[in-house]
UniProtKB/Swiss-Prot annotation:
InterPro entries linked: Cyt_c-like_dom, Cyt_c-like_dom_sf, Cytochrome_c4-like, Cytochrome_c_Oxidase_Subunit
Subcellular location: Periplasm
Domain of life according to the entry: Bacteria
Organism: Acidithiobacillus ferridurans
Posttranslational modification: Binds 2 heme c groups covalently per subunit.
GO molecular function, a single term: electron transfer activity
Protein name: Cytochrome c-552
Positions annotated to bind heme c 2: C166, C169, H170
Amino acid sequence: MTTYLSQDRLRNKENDTMTYQHSKMYQSRTFLLFSALLLVAGQASAAVGSADAPAPYRVSSDCMVCHGMTGRDTLYPIVPRLAGQHKSYMEAQLKAYKDHSRADQNGEIYMWPVAQALDSAKITALADYFNAQKPPMQSSGIKHAGAKEGKAIFNQGVTNEQIPACMECHGSDGQGAGPFPRLAGQRYGYIIQQLTYFHNGTRVNTLMNQIAKNITVAQMKDVAAYLSSL
């Protein structure tokens, strides 16, 4: 009986030792991985302001996390595609995030801190970079229900509900111009989110607040279905 207990204690001690060693190894690997990530992030951030760095590496690592290297493919449905977006529009939005005049929820959480680190030169460089990227090519066909109805709203508006045609500012093909953003191929969820913000006044823009105040949720989805399919 005594021998059995001793062996049992010995096994427990060996297990405790192995668990401790495994824990130390895990902590060590975690520390090394974290250190490596910090190093890579630091190198990427250092490259942002370097005129000698290849163009993609001038993009802040903060931008790449959500918008991707080229701004074509985003990780989240409410994160906008930036590839091919108009320079003046992007500059205006980054400045609005920086001075907190664009104050929607995601802007406050994610974009305010990022924009605070950008001076005028970096804002211009980022706008130039993403503007120069080729917009994504959408596959043919309707990805979301309501695209047909959305096309009618976009091109003709809804006169009896005092909703003007979107194409008057954003162009017949949704390409936009100057201060009016490109909407063709934009993310479905992002369009709905921003129309909601304009509708309820969360995102302040005198023109869009007036236009979106009468639009229904169903109409938002239809317009988003059409634009995201372009």
